[in-house]
Amino acid sequence: MKKIAVLTSGGDAPGMNAAVRAVVRKAMYYDIEVYGVYQGYQGLINNNIKKMERGTVGDKIQRGGTFLQSARCPEFKDPEVRKQAIANLNNLGIEGLVVIGGDGSYRGAQRLNEEGIKTIGIPGTIDNDINGTDFTIGFDTALNTIVEAIDKIRDTASSHERTFIVEVMGRDAGDLALWSGLAGGAETVLCPEHRKDVKVIADKIQQGIERGKKHSIIVVAEGVMTGEECGQELKKYINVDTRISVLGHMQRGGSPSGMDRVLASRLGGYAVELLMNDETGLAVGIQNNSLSKTKFEDIFTSVHHLDEKMYELSNELSI
């Protein structure tokens, strides 16, 4: 393989730049030309493809976001649109493509693979909701961002004896809510996988008040309900002073953590190795701290599961 390309797609995640850097540097080490596709699949369609040099990825490993930029591209589902994207790659002699993103990005990569472009997927999303890997690029950084916010919110919650509801990302997966709730000592965590009755939460807070507890933190994943909705429901059962904190897109930003930089570097390098070995239609991952590879179709046919033992522990420690 003489030429490959790399793109980032879907929601940005801290560490994507580190993954791009690893792909570029690893490929160049083996004298493979690398092209960067700007603005994700939209860039493939628009032929926004540029040759990368070693210096192109210099001073990028510590930067958040993605310098290749990203864009949603629903029209990529259209076979005629993909034909144009494939033609653009073929005209440049590009044989392989590395796609960094989430589930939707993987589906685009799978279609390209079926249509003749050798593809490898790298999991890049803060939600940690992709099968075939224990952790996704960006999850650790987002987790640290949320925990830092919870720590600061707890200071003011304690000062004013309030109940704070912290809304975090996670439409279908509760990993961010669970992990940040456990690390931040939250009194209650609401995950899409475990939809608690708000009355149960209210009873728990009331029991804490009766024991002398002056403040509480509730972490709710956006896929369960909004923080505002949670607060309104809570007031139906208990008279507490509540405040809502929606962390929003700040969870996606910031310099990637050391763990995310290392993970991204390992996965980026491994993706190039697979293409060099003519292996394709695969997503790379990390399982039990070892590099792994999974067929795209196997990722789509399995369901992401919350760590139930950790969920039980969170409940046990939040009495």
Curated annotation (Swiss-Prot):
Binding site for ADP: 21-25, 154, 185-187, 211, 213-215
Cited InterPro entries: ATP_PFK (IPR022953), ATP_PFK_prok-type (IPR012003), PFKA_ATP_prok (IPR012828), Phosphofructokinase_CS (IPR015912), Phosphofructokinase_dom (IPR000023), PKF_sf (IPR035966)
NCBIfam families recorded: PFKA_ATP, PRK03202.1
Pathway field: Carbohydrate degradation; glycolysis; D-glyceraldehyde 3-phosphate and glycerone phosphate from D-glucose: step 3/4
Active site positions, chain numbering: 127
Domain of life: Bacteria
HAMAP family: Phosphofructokinase_I_B1
GO terms, molecular function: 6-phosphofructokinase activity; AMP binding; ATP binding; fructose-6-phosphate binding; identical protein binding; metal ion binding; monosaccharide binding
GO biological process: canonical glycolysis; fructose 1,6-bisphosphate metabolic process; fructose 6-phosphate metabolic process
Main localization category: cytoplasm
Keyword presence, Metal-binding: yes
Keyword ATP-binding listed: yes
Known partners and oligomeric status: Homotetramer.
Record function comment: Catalyzes the phosphorylation of D-fructose 6-phosphate to fructose 1,6-bisphosphate by ATP, the first committing step of glycolysis.
Residues that hold substrate according to the record: 125-127, 162, 169-171, 222, 243, 249-252
Binding locations of Mg(2+): 103
Residues annotated to bind ATP: 11, 72-73, 102-105
Gene that this sequence comes from: pfkA
Protein name: ATP-dependent 6-phosphofructokinase
Family the entry assigns: Belongs to the phosphofructokinase type A (PFKA) family. ATP-dependent PFK group I subfamily. Prokaryotic clade 'B1' sub-subfamily.
Cofactor(s) essential for the protein: Mg(2+)
Regulation of protein activity: Allosterically activated by ADP and other diphosphonucleosides, and allosterically inhibited by phosphoenolpyruvate.
Protein location: Cytoplasm
GO terms under cellular component: 6-phosphofructokinase complex
Annotated keywords: Allosteric enzyme, ATP-binding, Cytoplasm, Glycolysis, Kinase, Magnesium, Metal-binding, Nucleotide-binding, Transferase
Catalytic activity: beta-D-fructose 6-phosphate + ATP = beta-D-fructose 1,6-bisphosphate + ADP + H(+)
Entry EC number(s): 2.7.1.11
